Design a protein with these regions (language model features):
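Glycine-rich segments within core transmembrane alpha-helices of 12-TM secondary carriers
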Residues: 58-59, 137-158
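Cytoplasmic membrane-interface "Motif A"-like loop-to-helix N-cap segments
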Residues: 71-85
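Residue-level signal for conserved functional micro-sites within the alpha-helical transmembrane segments
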Residues: 26, 55-62, 116, 150
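Paired intracellular helix-loop junctions of major facilitator superfamily
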Residues: 127-138
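Symmetry-related core transmembrane helices of the 12-TM Major Facilitator Superfamily/SLC fold
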Residues: 167-175
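Helix-loop boundary and gating motifs at the non-cytosolic
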Residues: 2-55
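Helix-to-loop junctions at the C-terminal end of transmembrane segments
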Residues: 60-75, 161-162
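Hydrophobic core of transmembrane alpha-helices in multi-pass small-molecule transporters
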Residues: 20, 91-92, 98-120, 126
Length: 175
């Protein structure tokens, strides 16, 4: 990390944008992955196995990516996180746009799980690095807005899927 500390406000905006993008991307695939898989012809058992493979890829890749980051301190965490998220986004787009068989789906879900799930602890580590250096990053605000983006994306995906206007959904939640 360089000796010049970044502007705290600018850093907050970047951190909030990163959290928002991560959780929106996570919601777009993860919240409905079982429905996506069964809609593509996989059985419930196969869908469960595929989801487990995705999670297992995250469990395996998370310590590997963290170890890589520790062994290469010259590579900023933001680059590792950015590359992880770009790879995961590309895999997510392939998954959403191109239906495929079991082998292709496993390959795409391994990339998605390995990089998307592994990037979140590194985002936390970035925030902790700045906090340790005395930069007053608003971690809780970024995390809260990220969670809000997850909820918003889920609502918009549901309203688009069931053709229900968002105000009807909000009204039913209020009742």
């Amino acid at each position: 990390m360089s000796s010049a500390l970044p502007d705290a406000r600018r850093l907050d905006y970047h951190y909030i944008a990163m959290q928002t993008g991560f959780w929106a991307m996570f919601a777009a695939v993860c919240a409905y992955q079982a429905a996506l898989l069964t809609a593509r012809g996989f059985t419930n058992g196969e869908a469960g196995m595929l989801i487990a493979v995705r999670c297992l890829a995250g469990i395996v890749c998370q310590p590997a990516l963290g170890s890589f980051a520790d062994r290469h301190p010259g590579i900023p965490l933001r680059r590792i996180v950015s590359l992880s998220l770009v790879l995961s986004l590309a895999a997510s787009l392939v998954f959403l746009l191109f239906p495929m068989g079991m082998a292709g789906t496993i390959a795409v879900l391994v990339v998605m799980g390995g990089f998307e799930i592994s990037s979140y602890p590194l985002m936390d580590a970035m925030a902790i690095q700045f906090i340790s250096l005395g930069v007053p990053i608003r971690y809780s605000l970024g995390r809260g807005i990220g969670s809000f983006s997850y909820a918003v994306v889920c609502i918009f995906l549901v309203t688009d899927t069931v053709h229900c206007p968002a105000h009807c959904l909000c009204h039913s939640l209020r009742s």
